[in-house]
Amino acid sequence: MRRKATLFDIAAALGISTGTVHRALHNNPGVSAATRDRVLEVSESLGYRPNLAARFLSQKTDFRMSVNTLIGTTSFWDEVRGGIEEGARALGLDNVELDFRTYPLLGDGEEEAFNAALESESNGIILFPSRPKSLRGWMKRATRAKVPVVCVSTDAPDTGRVAVVSIDTMASGSLAADLLGRFCGGKGTAAATLSALSINEHAEKIRAFQSTLAGLHPEMKFLEPVEDHDIESEAYDKCRKLFATHPDLRALYITTEASIPVIEAARDTGMLGQLSIIATDLFPKLADELRAGNVAATIYQRPRSQGRLAFQVLYDYLVEGRAANPQVTLAPHLVMRGNLDFFLQRQPVLGRVKSASAGAANGRFSGAGANAVSDTDVSDNFD
């Protein structure tokens, strides 16, 4: 028996996103006439028929998705939430509602936010699982209730989640190790900071960094990583202690967005000039440190793309009943002083997401229509 054609088949045949296929099939805005004609032609040739789930979603008066993330100390999580909003607008539907639930610290309010998502009868959940073990029971409960969960930025293995969208952590850690080893001539002491080793993404970066440093620059010493739990004061205090204890430190890898407290600690202890620093993500204060030469490079994790794709994966799962790719991994972007201005020109205005989505945290976004994006695949965008 011939397998039933899906949105994924049409998208693959045309080399476009499933969101574009959906908009074309439902005559929603944001798709050119030529693309719509191609989609209709290919869907007919493949024998595509909308399934009951797709029809259900099109007719629902209130399609609700809960977005559970950290508030964040920089623009990273604002960018993720902004990308999720863009993903919703891209479908051109007016009945998609996003309930944003944020928590201030790792694990602080995370379970309560998940419970609130289930109590509000969300159709699906996008989640940053900062404490996967404590969430395992909640996520199993969501699976039993047929509420799909997509993890964003980091994974929660063995929890029943349907997919994860994240940056390539192994590539990030390995790249940082190779560059710092080269900057230091393959000699000296290196250190790294992270939020918590219990977070899958952070642990993977550290493992990749340590392994690559040992393999490519065996004469370099790697210290015990510093856990700051995403608390700026803790990052500052612990790094001041690190610099006082190891005045010979040469290389520093900051694996998270919490780079400014670390840089300030280095500046206040007189260590900044002797350190080669690779940071993570990009925001105005960090851009200033790059321009000043205080930070050699930063590894950009493409948060807006992570958000867009997380929404698309969850929506596709609700429509098709499966995740075409349960592990979506994005390649990181390396930003240095030489390409910083070019990179910023290609990025959304850094402050825009802060003003657009900050008010949506612990709130609701709904509707699309006039704000639908063009019919390019979101994965083709520079972010």
Spans of model-derived segments:
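Hinge/cleft segment of the Venus flytrap/periplasmic-binding protein
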Residues: 213, 302-383
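An alpha-beta-alpha
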Residues: 84, 176-216, 224, 314, ...
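Amphipathic helical "hinge" segments at domain boundaries
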Residues: 50-112
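Hydrophobic alpha-helical
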Residues: 125-143, 209, 227-286
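N-terminal helix-turn-helix DNA-binding module of bacterial transcription factors
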Residues: 1-56
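Hinge/beta->alpha junction and helix N-cap segments in small-molecule ligand-binding domains
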Residues: 70-79, 99-110, 131, 154, ...
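Flexible loop/hinge segments that line or gate small-molecule binding clefts
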Residues: 131-171, 283-291
